[in-house]
Structure formats: C-alpha cells, structure tokens
C-alpha cells in the first residue's frame, strides 16, 4: 500500500506541481483524516461537489452519524494492535459534524482555529480551482458559492456547540499558530490538562523549524478574481468575526 501511495503522490505532483504550495502531501507526511469518509459517499473530500447542486443541498441535510460510525470503525481497525494511544486528527470538514465526534468519541478534545475570512474564503476557492484543471470553470461564479458554503459550515458548527461542554473545545487564532506555534501548543495542553514533557515540546519546536509556512512555495490568490468584494465577505461573516474576535489585519 505504501508503494502504491508513493507512486500516486509522485504522479499527482507531476500533473499539478502548484498544488504543493497549497496543501503538500506525500506518502510520508500526515494527511487529513476526513478521507476515511470517502467510502460512505457522504464526504466533503469529493471536492467541489459538496458546494454544487443537487449534491450540496442533499449533503447539508443528511444525518452524518452513520458515516461517522464507519469512520470510527476504521480508526479502531487501524489501531487494533496499538490500543490506548491517543489519535491526533484534523480536518475542517468536522465542523459539519461536531455532534457526531462528541457522541462517538466521548473523551475527545476539539481544537478549532480561526482565520480571517478574507484570506480563508479566497484560499479555499483557489485550492478547489486547482482540482478543476481541464474543466470549464468560471472563477467569478465560483467565489460566491465557496463563500456561502463556508459560512453555512461555520453556522452549523455554532448550532452544534450549543450542546457541547465548553471545556471540551479550545478556540485559537490561526495567526497565533503562525507567530508562536509551540507557545500555542502549550495553551492546548494546559486547557485539556495534558502532560507536556520537555521531549514533546522539543519535538514540536523541531518540526516547526523544519516546516516553516511557505516551505513548498507561496500560495498566491486574489479576492477579486473570484467575483467577491471585501464588503461581501465581511458582511456574510460578521457574526463569526465578532463571536471569535478574529484578527483582520
């Protein structure tokens, strides 16, 4: 399986080398766990389909619990020879199903990072565009679709959080991770009362030093290219910016 995955990524890098600037992956690096949901056919990792009709509306109306039960089973299967170890999993797609996570993993801790929507919406649109090579594509029509999709995802997560104990979640600013990654990690460990040894902290620091932002190239994108204005995004995400005091500089 490793050999097959390595060959897959090598071919993908050849076909779309610019994608490394956006979301670098290889057979030897971490990847988002949400790919485990691909087999349920109810997964945001299909790409733009979750933003397009009719699949988009169908997806947003579904009960995600059956898919997450499958997701949990896959994790158990992967861990069956190493019981008791703690998973560290990551995907923004989980914002659609925080209730599923807390139900199926009753001792889970949730870390949510917050980022300037002016950057996030455009960055996401650019990433999705990179997956549409060879297809007819209108950026100016796509931008508003991406904005609405992300706004609805955030709204969905806020509704679910009303039923989740605050001590199970920590909210962090994306800018803090970039400015002081290890210091932000300390805050996470303190919030969830987890032991942070000197060895673990050194390993975090070493990783941060070896993987600075932009290591694989700068991801360039411009708001206007996607048919959006600053005012539109600020208006749509005003509830989010105010709620989490998101830095806009």
Model-derived segments and spans:
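PAPS-dependent sulfation machinery
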Residues: 1-87
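Short, solvent-exposed loop/turn segments at secondary-structure junctions
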Residues: 42, 93-96, 116-119, 127, ...
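PAPS-dependent sulfotransferases, especially Golgi type II membrane carbohydrate sulfotransferases
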Residues: 51-68, 75, 79-82, 121-171, ...
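Short, conserved clusters of charged catalytic residues that mark active-site
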Residues: 70, 93-96, 152
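Short, hydrophobic/aromatic alpha-helical segments in well-folded domains
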Residues: 74, 97-100
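Long, contiguous hydrophobic alpha-helical segments, chiefly transmembrane helices and signal peptides
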Residues: 75, 87-88, 112-114, 233
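Short, well-ordered loop/turn elements at secondary-structure boundaries
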Residues: 81-85, 104-108, 166
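Conserved phosphate-donor/acceptor-positioning beta-strand/loop module used by diverse small-molecule
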Residues: 90, 101-126
């Amino acid at each position: 399986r490793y050999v097959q995955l390595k060959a897959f990524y090598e071919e993908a890098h050849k076909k779309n080398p610019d994608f490394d600037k956006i979301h670098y992956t290889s057979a030897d690096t971490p990847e988002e766990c949400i790919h485990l949901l691909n087999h349920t056919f109810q997964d945001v990792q299909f790409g733009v389909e979750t933003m397009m009709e009719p699949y988009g509306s169908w997806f947003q109306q579904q009960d995600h619990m059956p898919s997450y039960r499958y997701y949990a089973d896959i994790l158990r299967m992967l861990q069956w020879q190493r019981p008791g170890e703690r998973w560290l999993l990551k995907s923004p797609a989980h914002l659609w199903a925080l209730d599923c996570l807390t139900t199926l993993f009753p001792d889970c801790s949730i870390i949510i990072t917050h980022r300037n929507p002016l950057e996030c919406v455009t960055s996401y649109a650019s990433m999705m565009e990179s997956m549409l090579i060879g297809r007819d594509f209108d950026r100016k029509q796509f931008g508003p679709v991406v904005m609405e999709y992300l706004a609805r995802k955030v709204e969905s997560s806020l509704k679910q959080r009303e039923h989740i104990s605050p001590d199970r979640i920590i909210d962090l600013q994306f800018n803090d991770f970039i400015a002081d990654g290890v210091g932000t990690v300390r805050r996470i460990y303190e919030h969830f009362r987890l032991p942070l040894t000197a060895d673990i902290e050194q390993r975090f620091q070493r990783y941060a030093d070896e993987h600075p932002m932009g290591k694989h190239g700068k991801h360039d994108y411009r708001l206007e290219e996607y048919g959006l204005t600053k005012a539109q995004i600020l208006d749509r995400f005003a509830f989010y910016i105010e709620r989490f005091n998101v830095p806009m500089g």
